[in-house]
Regions:
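Conserved hydrophobic residue
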Residues: 22-23, 58, 138
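C-terminal all-alpha effector/ligand-binding and dimerization domain
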Residues: 96-240
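Beta-hairpin "wing" of winged helix-turn-helix
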Residues: 54-63, 69
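Extreme N-terminal segment that seeds HTH/winged-HTH DNA-binding domains in transcriptional regulators
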Residues: 1-42
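Extended, compositionally biased flexible segments
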Residues: 59-60, 84-87, 91-95
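Short, cationic-aromatic polyanion-contact patches
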Residues: 4-6, 30, 67-81
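Short, hydrophobic-biased segments on the C-terminal half of alpha helices
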Residues: 49-50
Length: 240
């Protein structure tokens, strides 16, 4: 089955759910209707719907159709189970996104940083610091490290837009897996300087290790979030 076909259908239906063309608790069009609309096979439609189920957007009901269970929320909603770019998250939440690069340099992984990040000591890395604005507020401080061997040609201009878009569509590398750790920490002087803290003295910190299709670590990132706009969502299914 062509991956691009079912992914295109998945993204199309997902976008319509987020736009509330298919509102919460409504039923999606029947399989036959979707097959006709997208000019595809039944298996392709079912694969697209399975992706939406995995994302928590719909729930299948045996013999009764597919019900929408996605609800838009007021806070910025990140997903734990998927890998999204900042721009994709902003679009999904209907927010205006701006990225400002505050540091862009090359560093060498020290023994201490190698133990923390998973890179090897002596690895040459891009070190990128970016402030993420949503609807005009500085809410996220991203501190990224990319292995230069796997991300050649990265520039500050690219970093101000989407590094993942560059990696996937220019370099042709597949981004497959991200391991995440979420904690709460006291805000640092850097957080208070760069983020709109609104009186908070702590930040939510998401640490990511991201791997390509060969299972190689190419990114280590620490994202520091202003708490008032921090909300991560996961989907859990009970198995018996």
């Amino acid at each position: 089955m062509p991956k691009a076909k079912y992914e295109g259908i998945y993204r199309s239906i997902k976008k319509r759910i987020e736009a509330q063309d298919y509102p919460y608790q409504s039923l999606l069009p029947s399989e036959n209707t979707l097959i006709e609309e997208y000019a595809c096979s039944r298996n392709t439609v079912r694969r697209a719907l399975a992706e939406l189920v995995a994302d928590g957007y719909v729930q299948t009901m045996q013999g009764r159709g597919v019900r929408v269970i996605y609800q838009p929320v007021g806070k910025t909603m990140f997903t734990i189970g998927g890998i999204e770019t900042f721009q994709e998250t902003a679009r999904r939440n209907h927010l205006r996104a701006v990225t400002k690069v505050t540091k862009f340099e090359t560093v060498i992984a020290t023994e201490q940083f190698a133990a923390e990040s998973g890179f090897s000591e002596g690895d040459e890395l891009w070190a990128v610091q970016r402030v993420r604005y949503l609807d005009g507020k500085a809410l996220i401080l991203d501190i990224n490290y990319f292995l230069k061997e796997f991300v050649p040609g990265l520039t500050e201009e690219i970093a101000s837009h989407s590094i993942y878009d560059f990696i996937e569509n220019v370099l042709g590398m597949q981004i497959i897996t991200s391991k995440r750790r979420i904690t709460v920490e006291h805000a640092t002087a850097r957080d208070e300087k760069l983020l709109d803290m609104d009186g908070y003295d702590c930040v939510a910190v998401v640490v990511n290790q991201t791997f390509n299709s060969d299972g190689m670590l190419f990114e280590y990132t620490q994202s520091r979030h202003q708490p008032d706009y921090f909300c991560f969502q996961d989907i859990a299914t009970r198995k018996k």
